[in-house]
Design a protein with these regions (language model features):
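A flexible loop/linker signature enriched in serine peptidases of the S9 family
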Residues: 1-11, 20-38, 46-55, 67-83, ...
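Residue-level detector of Asp-centered blade-edge/turn motifs that repeat once per structural unit
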Residues: 17-18, 64-65, 110-111
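Ligand-binding grooves and catalytic loops that recognize ribose/phosphate and carbohydrate rings
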Residues: 58
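A short helix->beta-strand "capping" segment at the edge of beta-propeller domains
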Residues: 2, 216-227
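A structural motif specific to WD40 beta-propellers
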Residues: 42, 93-94
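A structural signal for short secondary-structure junctions
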Residues: 76-77, 107-110, 132, 220-223
């Protein structure tokens, strides 16, 4: 069964991580998002915002929570920017990187808490319309917490991890106490009831394992939280 069937040329489709949406490039100059179950579509970028030069010249990637897309946005021939698109199209596209140089191929890392991309802003380059150029890899931190952790010294980072491990062990001990009490209660019930409870617990745990944390963005001073 065709997921998209119309008179348009639809290519470079990318599924959202949760499998509920698909984002194709329509007629090479429009990026859409389509809900697979309902068939509803929204336009993220249209033909007035994109141009086409060759096959495969559109680059975008889904966020882990399936709510955002990073896109290489090149309206002009002499530079490319990185934009953040709301997959529901309720928010306007937001420029994350707008250096005036070529900023390309943005990718989500650290479960969506950061992105990395390539830029020739500080590399060797030809200022003619053609010629070779040198790219470096940069990273942007979407939260202040992530940026602060990145800038910790080695000793500070070790201390932070030690505190987190201690807190985790304490939580585990507390959970173990609860589990022991629960087991005592279950032992008083028949094996059939035990199996039902265990089965339900497994289903709940499986659902929790599949849950993806919704991404957070600290917009203030975002452009300053960049490392090469």
């Amino acid at each position: 069964e065709a997921l998209i069937s119309n008179e348009k040329d639809n290519y470079l489709p990318k599924f959202s991580p949760d499998g509920s949406q698909i984002a194709p490039v329509e007629d090479r100059r429009t990026i859409k998002v389509r809900n697979i179950d309902s068939g509803d579509e929204v336009v993220l970028l249209d033909e007035t915002q994109l141009f086409h030069m060759r096959d495969g010249d559109k680059y975008f990637s889904w966020s882990p929570d399936s709510k955002w897309l990073l896109v290489e946005f090149d309206q002009l021939l002499n530079n490319a920017d990185v934009y953040l698109l709301d997959a529901s199209a309720k928010q306007e596209p937001k420029a994350l990187v707008n250096s005036g140089y070529y900023d390309r191929m943005p990718k989500w890392v650290q479960n969506g808490k950061q992105m990395i991309w390539m830029s020739n802003r500080n590399g060797l380059k030809s200022y003619a319309t053609s010629g070779s150029t040198e790219y470096d890899v940069y990273s942007m931190f979407f939260t202040q917490e992530g940026w602060d952790e990145f800038n910790l010294s080695e000793e500070q980072y070790k201390l932070k991890k030690a505190i987190e491990e201690a807190q985790s062990e304490q939580e585990t001990d507390e959970e173990s106490s609860v589990e022991k009490e629960a087991k005592k209660i279950l032992e008083k019930r028949n094996s059939k009831a035990n199996n039902v409870v265990k089965g339900a617990a497994q289903v709940i745990q499986q659902r929790k394992d599949k849950e993806v944390e919704e991404l957070q963005f600290d917009w203030d001073n975002l452009e300053d939280r960049v490392a090469k």
